Design a protein with these regions (language model features):
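Histidine-/acidic-rich catalytic cores in large beta-rich domains
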Residues: 1-254
């Protein structure tokens, strides 16, 4: 190896690839607000899916966008994080940005979808949190999902960790959840009121071939997030047993 550039992030015609997400073997996902494309290392598009006009949840969902994360499942289907603009009076009198997950076949058919607002009661929000969410701060982006991953084979006996279930991260809620892929129910969560992570990103269940297999590894951002807002002035990488939960963060050494 001589250190030369093998693959530029920007194609020759100069259009930036927004949110390039590595995928193996030898592929990368380019996620834009209106489409997701799978590219080979020569920037050839080998698969593409355009944003649907709506997802059938109401008159306001014509603003569907893709964001943050794309996952290729073992069965060849693709999971995409997206958001819709909806109004849910039971949550807020204002228009909200709600996060959803769709599963798309290689042929471009949506065969599964999951909306956060439909599971609002499963998060266990306090009365205070409900009032703050109703105020629709941040333009109504009340939960702000930033990652989704598929649970890999693991040694846990808890059915929440059945391979194929989905681990999802919500920045604004400082919460991670597991969705039962078969039923859609939230079957595990860390947050929203233990304040052990703040604005975390990219949680993953470690696979069997890595040290700590079955643990959750996440980047715990810190900063401001939560209802009510919590603040921490530093970030950390946290690995924890999901049946015990993350430990409270310690102040970094000076």
């Amino acid at each position: 190896m001589n250190g030369g550039l093998r693959v530029p992030r920007t194609p020759r015609h100069g259009t930036p690839l927004y949110e390039p997400i590595p995928e193996s073997p030898g592929r990368v996902f380019a996620l834009q607000t209106r489409s997701v494309s799978e590219l080979d290392w020569d920037s050839n598009v080998v698969w593409q899916f355009a944003v649907p006009v709506n997802l059938g949840v109401g008159d306001l969902d014509r603003g569907v966008i893709f964001h943050h994360d794309v996952v290729r499942r073992a069965n060849g289907n693709t999971l995409v994080l997206c958001s819709v603009r909806i109004q849910v009076p039971a949550i807020s009198p204002s228009v909200l940005t709600d996060d959803c997950i769709i599963e798309v076949t290689p042929a471009g058919e949506i065969i599964w979808q999951w909306f956060t607002f439909q599971h609002f009661e499963e998060f266990g929000f306090t009365t205070e949190a409900r009032q703050l969410i109703a105020e629709a701060r941040n333009g109504g982006d009340w939960a702000h999902a930033n990652a989704v991953s598929e649970i890999p084979p693991n040694h846990h006996s808890d059915p929440a960790f059945t391979p194929g279930n989905l681990l999802v991260s919500y920045r604004e809620l400082s919460t991670m959840i597991i969705i039962d892929k078969a039923t859609g129910a939230i079957v595990w969560k860390a947050g929203p009121h233990d304040n052990l992570t703040i604005g975390q990103h990219q949680p993953e269940v470690l696979p069997l071939d890595l040290p700590g297999a079955g643990n959750v590894l996440t980047f715990d951002n810190g900063g401001e997030a939560g209802y009510p807002t919590q603040f921490r002035s530093f970030s950390r990488v946290a690995e924890f047993d999901p049946l015990i939960g993350p430990r409270p963060p310690r102040e970094p050494l000076a």
